[in-house]
Swiss-Prot record:
Name recorded for this polypeptide: tRNA uridine 5-carboxymethylaminomethyl modification enzyme MnmG
Subunit structure and binding partners: Homodimer. Heterotetramer of two MnmE and two MnmG subunits.
Annotated compartments: Cytoplasm
Organism: Syntrophomonas wolfei subsp. wolfei (strain DSM 2245B / Goettingen)
GO terms classed as biological process: tRNA methylation; tRNA wobble uridine modification
Matches recorded under PROSITE patterns: GIDA_1 (PS01280), GIDA_2 (PS01281)
Pfam families, per database record: GIDA, GIDA_C_1st, SAM_GIDA_C
GO terms for cellular component: cytosol
Length: 624
């Protein structure tokens, strides 16, 4: 029997990384919010890799932080190792990566949720969504509780009709053998939403007591304290190492001998997997010319013996998994604690969404995370934040919050999801961002904190820290620009000679000199030419000076890009009346309904000739 259980302004279904950000954003913006989860014990679960960050992902975590989200703060409290990767490359692709204590990550997020005003948590399975006149009206749980809402955010992860597969064994289930959301997919289909089926997988977890680390290469964290959040304290806590080993010819032969039992190759798995995180058996087959693959043995926390075998994502039968593991150096006597598996799940094709992450055909329904066809905790959290913000803004009858591709990796991802044809799990990569030199992890606060303040997510403490940083950067950069030396200056001549770099021929500022690869901002601090500021400020000054020319070029590119972005397309346009558009372009434009010519230009199937036709049509219409 269905009964009236209550009413909320915003309801969020699912409490993974997307759901937590959505619920916190909505509540912090003043909306009475309900977060519904199938298990309070699995809130902010890390069912796959125990890490946050990496290329493109670290930039996203920093963007979430700058806007007032939680992921960065949470991983700073719960990491067991943190380091910067890609240090040999430019700042556009350098990235933080932290190993998480999975249990502590869950507990820290749970604490934050419990302490958040205007946020309630309910453990239940939602099986139906009620609509009224094409708008979300209420949700109904399996036990009959009916909650009304003004906006609904779906962040169901891989639970929608989840199916676990190990060898020839399969059963209904969510990540880590939890219950799946069995009925909600049917409710979405009744709304007319188009669903697909994707697949992901996870490696086995092994007992650290059975590992011979002497046969592996230690991978320590950075010695200097690091942080994801711009406002976290810098703490130099004890770190746990990761370990590097490799598969070998024997390992690969075991896989090849058992392909007839691999569900990836027997047809048991129907869902489409991610290209950038293939199963181990897929790697062995696709890269048969390689004799070995890297495998990282990673701790899952400080108070557990479980370790994660990064790079060995598999759905091979359990006995084959054991044989594979025991062929790897250091794992000859290994014990499995949890078997690796594949999971299939339902997704909503994201072309059915607006840039606000609201469904085009169902008013008040927002979706975020793996339900939108993405992979990764960071991608999910970012979408959850945006969906939560826009759900709250809609309740307040305000305009949606939409970032541009030139402003954030978050925008690159959302824009890609809606405009590209997503046929496999989407992973954010630095190569997807046209303006990645502008979208660095170090300047996310400078790009986005003001926007977070405007929508009500950046509190006074964060705002004051941001303003102080801006002020220091301006003062110090001006000092470097106006402090100059001539060739006659002996102190400068000795300094440059000691750094094995050419002497100056004309008057040069410290700012200009810093462009030389031989010189570091810390050299200036050592000489007393610059104050010993916070490391974030010193890093920012150095990047701005060294890459000033390249940064200015990208800013010019952005100006050209924004000309098309600012050419808006009327929402009532009839593409059948736009003479000269290709048939495919008409079809795709009708589905996506782009808001601007810039967005239209990025739709798969819309070519430059179609854009020219569209521009001419809009100009003629404007002149009438």
């Amino acid at each position: 029997m269905i009964y009236k259980a209550g009413s909320y302004e915003v309801i969020v279904i699912g409490a993974g990384h997307a759901g937590c950000e959505a619920a916190l954003a909505s509540a912090r913006m003043g909306c009475q919010t309900l977060l519904v989860t199938m298990s309070i014990d699995h809130i902010a679960l890390m069912p796959c890799n125990p890490s946050i960050g990496g290329p493109a992902k670290a930039q996203v975590v920093r963007e979430i932080d700058a806007l007032g989200g939680e992921m960065a703060l949470n991983i700073d409290k719960a990491n067991v190792q943190i380091r910067t990767i890609n240090t040999g490359k430019g700042p556009a692709v350098q990235a933080l990566r932290a190993q998480a204590d999975k249990r502590q990550y869950h507990l820290e997020m749970l604490k934050t949720l419990f302490n958040q005003k205007k946020l309630d948590i309910l453990m239940a399975e939602v099986e139906d969504i009620e609509l009224s006149a094409g708008r979300v009206k209420a949700i109904v749980t399996r036990t009959g509780a009916r909650f009304e809402c003004q906006a609904l955010v779906l962040t169901t992860g891989t639970y929608l009709k989840g199916r676990i597969i190990v060898g020839d064994i399969s059963f209904d289930g969510g990540p880590g053998n939890q219950f799946p959301a069995a009925r909600l997919s049917e409710s979405l289909k009744r709304m007319g939403l188009r669903l697909g089926r994707f697949k992901t997988g996870t490696p086995p977890r092994i007992d650290s007591k059975s590992v011979d680390f002497s046969k592996m290469i230690e991978q320590p964290g950075d010695k200097r304290p690091l942080r994801f959040s711009f406002i976290s304290p810098l703490i130099n806590r004890p770190q746990l190492p990761c370990w590097l080993t490799h598969s070998n010819k024997k390992t690969h032969q075991i896989v090849m001998n058992n392909l007839d039992r691999a569900p990836m190759y027997t047809g048991i798995i129907k869902g489409i997997g991610t290209r950038y995180c293939p199963s181990f058996e897929d790697k062995v087959v696709r890269f048969s010319h390689k004799d070995s693959h890297q495998l990282f043995i990673e701790p899952e926390g400080r108070d557990t013996d479980e370790m994660y075998v990064q790079g060995l994502n598999t759905s091979l039968p359990e006995d084959v998994q054991i044989e594979v593991l025991k062929s790897i150096p250091g794992l000859e006597n290994v014990r499995i604690m949890r078997t690796g598996y594949a999971i299939e799940y339902d997704i909503i094709y994201p072309s059915q969404l607006k840039l606000s992450l609201e469904c085009k055909t169902v008013e008040g329904l927002f979706t975020a995370g793996q339900i939108n066809g993405t992979s990764g905790y960071e991608e999910a959290a970012a979408q959850g934040l945006i969906a939560g913000i826009n759900a709250a803004l809609q309740v307040k009858e305000k305009e949606p919050f939409i970032l541009k591709r030139s402003e954030a990796y978050i925008a690159v991802m959302i824009d890609d999801l809606i405009n590209k044809e997503i046929v496999e799990p989407y992973r954010l990569l630095t190569s997807r961002a046209e303006y990645r030199l502008l979208l660095r992890q170090d300047n996310a606060d400078l790009r986005l904190t003001e926007k977070g303040r405007q929508i009500g997510l950046v509190d006074d403490n964060r705002w004051m820290a941001y303003q102080q940083k801006e002020e220091i950067l301006e003062v110090e950069s001006n000092e470097l620009k106006f402090s100059s030396f001539t060739p006659a200056d002996e102190e400068m001549a000795d300094f440059l000679s000691g750094k094995n770099t050419a002497a100056i021929r004309d008057r040069v500022s410290l700012w200009e000199l810093l462009r030389r690869p031989e010189l570091s901002i810390y050299d200036y601090v050592e000489k007393g030419w610059l104050r010993d500021n916070d490391p974030d400020i010193l890093e920012q000054l150095e990047i701005q000076a060294k890459y000033e020319g390249y940064i200015e070029k990208q800013k010019e590119q952005v100006k050209r890009f924004e000309k098309l972005e600012n050419k808006m397309i009327p929402p009532d346009i009839n593409y059948d009346e736009v003479y000269g558009l290709s048939q495919e372009a008409v079809q795709k434009l009708k589905i996506i309904l782009p808001a601007s010519v810039g967005q239209a230009s990025r739709i798969a199937g819309v070519n430059p000739a179609d854009i020219n036709v569209l521009l001419i049509f809009l100009e003629k219409k404007r002149r009438k």
